[in-house]
Amino acid sequence: MSTAVRYYSRGGKTKEVAEYLAQAAGVQAVSVDTQAAAIKEPVDVLFVGGALYAYGLDKHLSSWLDDLDAKMVKKAVLFSTSWISKHALDLMREKLTAKGIPVEEKTLYLKSKEAAGSRQTAEAFAKQFL
């Protein structure tokens, strides 16, 4: 099963969770603000993560989702960290489903203060889809 992990993080919490998910999947977590983030080969599971910034997704993540080729992704699984709101999960889901990419109902949401030391939680979450 092929897997990829993509994320955008300003403060490092979402990056930390992305790296835990990637370790569980045996892949590298890649920030969407890098050229390496492009999905060039089809993946069965794409973990996508981000947070809410000023009531929306960061422009890097939003743009990357807009450019994502739906034919390259069999299913997306969402994760997010934030201080107060899970709304980033809804916004990512909307963008992906609008492209015709199936999105897993289960998501991983951690409040920012919970992200540190969340390795076991993130790995257990990832293993459900691998």
Regions found by a protein language model. Give the residues of each.
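FMN-binding flavodoxin-like domain, especially the glycine-rich phosphate-binding loop
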Residues: 3-4, 9-16, 20-30, 40-130
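Conserved SAM/SAH-binding loop
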Residues: 32-36
